[in-house]
Amino acid sequence: MTQLSLSRRNFLAASAAGLAIRPWSRVLGANSDIRVAVIGVRNIGKTHLMNFPKIPGVRVVAVCDIDSDVLGQRATEFEKQFGAIRKYTDLREVMDAPDVDAVVLAVPNHWHALGTIWACQA
């Protein structure tokens, strides 16, 4: 019997990415962008922000981080690419935003489960 080389971390990351996509509150047409909020913008979140412009049909509309200094720095840095970006310090407010279609949870591990549950409920 062979063992899979899938680590717990990779499994959880893939699962969280799939579950974090919110159900759309509007019908998306063929030309509609997916509006994304990135929660946690220090390291992994910054990497996601740098790569979203390479994905057609994806637009970052909001960023969230508990550290207001990092939040302001990232928002200023990436508004040149994405246009106006709303800033949040509480991820619960992001989940309530009506124009966010998907969220990226680039947060510490202990926030993954609760953040994913809130995203699915939104």
Regions found by a protein language model. Name each.
Residues 1-122:
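N-terminal glycine-/serine-/threonine-rich beta1-alpha1-beta2 phosphate-ribose binding loop
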